[in-house]
Amino acid sequence: MAIDQTTDVIEAYYATWQNGIDSFDEAGLRGMLAEDFVYEGPMAGRRPGVESFTQGLKAFVKTLKGMRMIAQLRNGDEAAFLYDCDVSQPAGTFRFAEFLRIGDGQIHEVKLVFDATEFRKAANP
């Protein structure tokens, strides 16, 4: 995939959710996730499928107050991002590392790394 197309997919992905629930574009997000999409993260583990990822991201975005991109690295169809999110539940600022694999104009894989301690506490009070 050309770098410009990869860049377009990445920018569209973050645009679907980075500004919180009021501008969350669920249809746009679903349209950019490949049929063989797989998500991996510290709370959900490794899960195939668009539905569980979309619903999980939507739940997170409901708590999102702000997002600041810190760093981006790209290598062909793969990209890595480091960003901070301000969230209301659990309250605070949390750092995330996210790795995307893109092909044919769609996202095939998202791997998310973050300290899930406070999120687990909030999910199981």
Please provide the spans of the model-predicted regions:
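C-terminal and inter-domain tail/linker signature
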Residues: 1-125
